[in-house]
Amino acid sequence: MESKIYTVSEVTGRITELLTSDSVLNDLWITGEISNFHHHNSGHMYFTIKDERSCIKSIMFRGYNRKLKFEPEDGLKVNAHGYVGVYKPRGDYQFYVDHLEPAGKGALYLAFEQLKEKLEKEGLFNEDHKKEIPLLPRKIGVVTSPTGAAIRDILSVVKRRFKNVSVLIVPSLVQGKKAAREIVEGIEYLNSRDDIDVIIVSRGGGSIEELWSFNEEVVARAIYNSRIPVISGVGHETDFTIADFVADLRAPTPSAAAELAISNRIELEKHLVNLYTRLYNSVSYQIKSYRDRLNSLSLKKVLTRPEELFIQKIQYVDELSRRLDWAMEGRLKDAREKFRVLSGKLDSLSPLKTIERGYSITLKGSEPINSITQVDIGDVIRSRLSDGIILSQVKRTMKEGEQDG
């Protein structure tokens, strides 16, 4: 009997049928560690899920991975749901993932830690960037739900502590998919106004899922970029969100946020009285100190007979004047002596001294003649003597040793 020969595509199709007909492989949870993770420009994620002995290539299409709250990475242990199929062009079997979650840690918790680490490295939590909360704001902007308990608590505290302070409420969702965007828009709107001195971003307590809007990166960056100081008052005292780390001041509750935003009127009055008392005591001490110094100086001899101070100074000036005269006289004497010596040396080197000893200087024009080659027959020359000048005309020149014939 002759064996049937199959094409590669036929074999691949048969394998695909076997896999798709297996109910276990069509609805499957796999646990393992991610390796070779790659987030493609198309938005699809490619990675391998492995354990100690085996591995399986996996893909998570963009439509599914957009729902992830965390970013998969190499070394992360995960639980993945999907089905096993075949990629026919290469004949590879692979795992098509439609749901992915960290093994052991919740996806939201992991996303929180990843974003916190990222923003901290960027410097969004740095203390030197945080703005000072004004002592007594004129108007407070509040981004929160207009119907929640948080806004009622805030308004109650404001009324009790300093009822003259104005509050502008910017309504916003505080949970759900659209909440983060509305919170950002509320912060940006308050920054566009000129009458807001401080912003409170707030909501009541809840689960991590309910508070998640305040862990979104867009909210964190809006708080960081706000030119107006921002106080976060999210959840209960034990709840922490990314917004708390970025805010200029973190309050454990909405009520506490309002208390931190404005001073109690009675406390402010006490503070002003305390400042006045400290200022009064400081000025009084300075006055007493200056009075004591003045009294002490009035007892000194120099102030009972102040003319003695001037007499001593006059004598000192006279003494300095005499010293200056002596110094100048000595310098002039030295200078005169140096001038006399130099004049003598200069005089001894003068050509006129040579003339006085019986010599003469012969010139052609203004140039001295020191060789017979400098003159021609018929030239008029001048001889300088000690008592005058002789004009001569050259009739003949003779070299050294030549006889007059």
From Swiss-Prot:
InterPro entries: Exonuc_VII_L (IPR003753), Exonuc_VII_lsu_C (IPR020579), OB-fold_nuc-bd_dom (IPR025824)
CDD domains on file: ExoVII_LU_OBF (cd04489)
Keyword Iron: no
Gene Ontology MF terms: exodeoxyribonuclease VII activity; nucleic acid binding
UniProt main location, coarse: cytoplasm
Enzyme class: hydrolase
Gene Ontology, cellular component aspect: cytoplasm; exodeoxyribonuclease VII complex
Enzyme Commission identifier(s): 3.1.11.6
Annotated keywords: Cytoplasm, Exonuclease, Hydrolase, Nuclease
Compartments (UniProt record): Cytoplasm
One Pfam assignment: Exonuc_VII_L
Protein's UniProt keywords contain Transmembrane helix: no
GO BP, sorted A to Z: DNA catabolic process
Annotated catalysed reactions: Exonucleolytic cleavage in either 5'- to 3'- or 3'- to 5'-direction to yield nucleoside 5'-phosphates
Subunit organization: Heterooligomer composed of large and small subunits.
The protein's role, per its UniProt record: Bidirectionally degrades single-stranded DNA into large acid-insoluble oligonucleotides, which are then degraded further into small acid-soluble oligonucleotides.
Annotated family: Belongs to the XseA family.
Identification of the protein by name: Exodeoxyribonuclease 7 large subunit
Native source species: Halothermothrix orenii (strain H 168 / OCM 544 / DSM 9562)
Gene (UniProt): xseA
